[in-house]
Design a protein with these regions (language model features):
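Sequence-level preference for short, compositionally simple segments enriched
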Residues: 2-3, 27-39, 152, 156-528
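Cleavable N-terminal signal peptides of Sec/SRP-targeted secreted and luminal proteins
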Residues: 12-31
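Transmembrane alpha-helices of multi-pass eukaryotic membrane proteins
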Residues: 15-17, 64-67, 130, 163-168
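Short N-terminal segments immediately surrounding and downstream of signal-peptide cleavage
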Residues: 37-51
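Extended, amphipathic alpha-helical segments that serve as helical scaffolds
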Residues: 56-143
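Phosphate-/polyanion-interacting regions in eukaryotic proteins
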Residues: 70, 109, 127, 131-143, ...
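Long, hydrophobic, amphipathic alpha-helical segments used as structural scaffolds
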Residues: 81-84, 88, 116, 120-124, ...
Length: 528
């Protein structure tokens, strides 16, 4: 019998050999592109150690050059996915503890490949599409998340180091693709200073919400005609939410699942391939999905989520999401969302540390209660949180932080916008602290109670990000709204101008006018 790579008895040797071959293929591929491009990309990059083929002069941007850059990122992502897939097979056989974070990377790479493929299709038609900015920003966030998951495991070994190396290589090429795109967009009159678009006029709903989805959000349960009904007592089509999700037909249409009143002890994952899923409950506190995974319990932050929604077009209405791990469990996510154009409406999200993980892409939260302690709203999406109750609860720490925004690149169109909310809770609460170098958070037209610390915002560690972050306030009220005692950082803006504040509205920040109307959620598109 002929011996091949995949018939060798030692799986560790197979993985080592596969890794060696992938590295050589990557090196050869990079050299060929660099030679054929005649150093086209050698003069422009913020990552001088990344491939020369992923660089270009800012002054000589072309659609072809940008496509070459994205194609290189796509090739890197394919190689990284191949490594991640084979590592997961090896880990299943050996029951290695690295399985969880490599699985995270695999899921995130699948999402990245889909977004990069869309970009290639759009740009080959020479179309200017604002979705490209969101997808590149999210692809970069995915690699940062992969590296974060790997770093959280104490068993970080040579396999993890290999996966981390590929994630860093892909990060470099994605950074340069994003740099090229934003450089070109800045030359266009449609480019806005904040969210990457010019500001749009007020409208009842962001335009990315279709009229049919809008009707669904306001419809009664009887009018919904759900595709599946979940009831613990057996009166529905399924007894568990996971069973109902698995039963949904594949396709691009809207799938509605009604969750009857009750408590469902499940951990759910809606993958990127499962799009346009709508979960509808019977009301806050009536329909409850609860899990208890936590960092202290052995789960990394990404995998700790009670409910994870990665498929685009996710909608949740009238549901309570809970992580019951407790105040000493460290990171314990109740809801993680990496779904583009997602809506969470009239829900409750309850936890302690890291309650709501707004991972990536465009998101909107309305009339939702979000409760937690440390960094209880965090991530790197472009998210507007509007007309919500943000409650800082008593935990194991003396200090609480409402937000920890994770923007790692100045060209990402991401950030947290809190508008017309009530922020209340225990004493010693800060509005936020910078998780990443270019953290961006704005609180505007909201009521801040006396629990807010006079300085308003807190450092993460020393002087980290204090000059590069973007924190702002506009038109707030209540005992904690005075900016007279606020921090004196270069990146803090105590009084945003009207134009600056408009850039963080539903219309200005998440292009809500193009997609929210279809979901049916009530929203304010501009300033109040």
């Amino acid at each position: 019998m002929v011996t091949t790579l995949f018939s060798l008895p030692n799986h560790k040797f197979r993985i080592k050999l596969l890794f060696f071959l992938i590295l050589n293929l990557l090196s050869l591929h990079t050299s060929v592109i660099a030679h054929s491009s005649n150093s086209k990309f050698t003069k422009f990059t913020r990552h001088p150690n990344s491939d020369s083929s992923s660089r270009t002069k800012r002054s000589t941007f072309s659609n072809k050059g940008f496509l070459n850059s994205v194609q290189l990122s796509l090739d890197h992502a394919l190689l990284a996915r191949s490594l991640a897939f084979n590592l997961t097979l090896s880990h299943r056989a050996s029951q290695t503890l690295m399985l969880d974070p490599v699985n995270d990377c695999l899921e995130l790479l699948d999402d990245t490949l889909e977004m990069l493929s869309r970009i290639v299709v759009i740009k080959r038609k020479d179309q200017v599409n604002d979705d490209v900015h969101t997808w590149l920003s999210a692809a970069l966030t995915n690699q940062e998340t992969c590296k974060q998951s790997l770093s959280e495991k104490s068993s970080f070994n040579k396999d993890g180091i290999a996966m981390d190396s590929f994630a860093r290589k892909l990060t470099g090429s994605l950074t340069n693709s994003l740099d090229m795109f934003v450089s070109d967009k800045r030359k266009s009159s449609s480019y806005g200073v904040i969210g990457g678009r010019k500001l749009l006029s007020d409208h009842d709903f962001p335009t990315w919400v279709s009229s049919s989805d809008r009707k669904l959000l306001e419809a009664s349960v009887e009018e919904l005609r759900p595709h599946a009904v979940v009831a613990a007592d057996g009166s529905g089509t399924h007894r568990s939410v996971a069973e109902a999700l698995a039963s949904l037909a594949k396709g691009s249409g809207r799938s509605v699942i009604h969750l009857a009143a009750g408590t469902y002890k499940e951990n759910l994952n809606i993958p990127s391939k499962q799009k346009n899923v709508m979960l509808v409950g019977d009301g806050k506190g009536k329909t409850v999905i609860v899990g208890s995974r936590s960092n202290r319990g052995g789960w990394n932050t990404y995998q700790s989520a009670t409910v994870a929604a990665m498929g685009d077009g996710f909608i949740a209405r009238d549901i309570t999401f809970v992580n019951s791990a407790g105040p000493s469990a460290e990171q314990a996510v109740a809801l993680r969302v990496g779904s583009d154009r997602s809506v969470v409406y009239r829900c409750s999200i309850d936890g302690y540390q890291d309650t709501l993980y707004t991972l990536s892409k465009r998101q909107f939260y309305r009339e939702t209660d979000i409760t937690g302690t440390v960094d209880f709203i965090f991530g790197n999406s472009a998210v507007v949180i509007q007309s919500c109750n943000l409650v800082s609860r008593k935990g194991s720490s003396e200090q609480n932080y409402v937000t920890a925004q994770g923007r790692s690149d100045p060209n990402q169109n991401t950030g947290i916008s809190i508008q017309n909310c009530r922020i209340t809770g225990s004493t010693g609460t800060y509005l936020g602290r910078p998780w990443k170098q270019y953290s961006r958070t704005v609180v505007m037209q909201s009521v801040l109670d006396g629990s807010i610390h006079p300085s308003g915002w807190s450092a993460w560690s020393g002087n980290f990000a204090l000059k590069t972050l973007y924190y702002g306030e506009f038109g707030n009220s209540g005992p904690g709204s005075s900016v007279s005692g606020r921090v004196n950082w270069a990146g803090y803006h105590p009084a945003l101008t009207l134009t600056e504040a408009q850039g963080f509205t539903v219309s200005g920040f998440i292009d809500g006018k193009s997609w929210l109307p279809s979901t049916g959620v009530v929203f304010d598109s501009g300033l109040l």
